[in-house]
């Protein structure tokens, strides 16, 4: 069971809504993933009506919506988008995204921290997308963010956990949930994130662009479950030396 702020989730896999070939395929993949928290970009949704092609099927699916501020380049733009989302969707949950460079889509640490502090004060449950910077993640936690979402690699790159060393530090020091976001390309990446101690992962591109998004979503669900179970089972420690799995000495002595 995963708890973030006032909500609990059975699934440790969060999903996105971008890049799917159709809304129907998006919903089928989300259902196959078992995800209960789904993020959507406010710039892609018609907030004036709930029969929007993206919004309506998500509401019907009964998932928790996590609007994000993707497209915002400054703290001010992100805060404006947050208030629009709260008014239109009736939720104070927010994935905070601020990336001024359209080429790399890397989060702006200064603007993100600035916006996060203000949004928390305004009553939002803030989940910030951020770089894998242990100091920044601690600062975001200190200003009241409900979780931190450090990247594994650049958005949509499918490179995996390129920031593993920093993620391990973030996880070790965090007192709020850590959700690895961005760069996860295959189910094994997700399993590794859960094994190393992450509380959840957010996956979008890897599912949406797969030849079979529904089965890929199912694969991610199983990988996350496996990674979590492996961590809870207490894996053996790594060693530089070989250790025999059978006690050969006793066998030889008995045969003598």
UniProtKB/Swiss-Prot annotation:
CDD domains cross-referenced by the UniProt entry = ThiG (cd04728)
Q: What is its EC number?
A: 2.8.1.10
Annotated active site: 95
Q: Which reaction does it catalyse?
A: [ThiS sulfur-carrier protein]-C-terminal-Gly-aminoethanethioate + 2-iminoacetate + 1-deoxy-D-xylulose 5-phosphate = [ThiS sulfur-carrier protein]-C-terminal Gly-Gly + 2-[(2R,5Z)-2-carboxy-4-methylthiazol-5(2H)-ylidene]ethyl phosphate + 2 H2O + H(+)
Major site of localization recorded for this protein: cytoplasm
Which Pfam families is this protein grouped with? ThiG
DNA-binding recorded as keyword: no
Give the pathway.
Cofactor biosynthesis; thiamine diphosphate biosynthesis
Catalytic EC class: transferase
- Where on this chain does 1-deoxy-D-xylulose 5-phosphate bind? 156, 182-183, 204-205
Regarding protein family, the annotation reads:
Belongs to the ThiG family.
What is its biological role?
A: Catalyzes the rearrangement of 1-deoxy-D-xylulose 5-phosphate (DXP) to produce the thiazole phosphate moiety of thiamine. Sulfur is provided by the thiocarboxylate moiety of the carrier protein ThiS. In vitro, sulfur can be provided by H(2)S.
- The protein depicted here goes by the name Thiazole synthase
Q: Origin organism of this chain?
A: Shigella boydii serotype 18 (strain CDC 3083-94 / BS512)
